Amino acid sequence: MGPMKVLLVLLVVMVAAPHIADAWQQPSCSSICDYSCGKSACISYSGRCGCCASCRRGPIYG
């Protein structure tokens, strides 16, 4: 493999890793919403948590 292909593989792994880790851990909804609701991070959990889904309707970033 050439150096460009190696870099491409590394990039894909780095982008995918957080999503894989998140799906694996499935943190509890209450802790996510306590710390993330009202922040942009909340949106990534909107499908999983009812409280973050309600936060999603009127997100306050920051």
From Swiss-Prot:
Signal peptide: 1-23
GO biological process, one term: killing of cells of another organism
Modification after translation: The amidated form is probably the active form.
Function: Has weak antibacterial activity, mainly against marine Gram-positive bacteria like C.maltaromaticum (MIC=200 uM), C.mobile (MIC=100 uM), C.divergens (MIC=200 uM) and C.funditum (MIC=200 uM) but also against C.glutamicum (MIC=50 uM). Has very little or no activity against Gram-negative bacteria.
Assigned protein family: Belongs to the paralithocin family.
SS bond partners: C29-C55, C33-C51, C37-C49, C42-C52
Alphabetized UniProt keyword annotations: Amidation, Antibiotic, Antimicrobial, Disulfide bond, Signal
PTM sites of type Tyrosine amide: Y61
The keyword Cytoplasm is assigned to this record: no
Protein name: Paralithocin 1
